[in-house]
Amino acid sequence: MQVSVRDNNVDQALRALKKKLQREGVFREMKLKQHYEKPSEKRAREKAEAIRRARKLARKKLQREGML
């Protein structure tokens, strides 16, 4: 990953790098890999995340249809 530093503005370059890393999911992956996760725990976590995503999508869909 590469970020260009313009006009010696390191703070802006760091913000851009952090945003790119966040978008790529690097921080989330690092947090998950700090400790070993048993395969059964991983499946349970992924299933819970999928359920959460589905609920959020359904809620958004209902809200959109309710607005019409």
From Swiss-Prot:
One of its GO terms (molecular function) is structural constituent of ribosome. NCBIfam families: S21p (TIGR00030). The gene is rpsU. This is Small ribosomal subunit protein bS21. GO terms for cellular component: ribonucleoprotein complex; ribosome. Transmembrane segments: none annotated. GO terms for biological process: translation. Keywords: Ribonucleoprotein, Ribosomal protein.
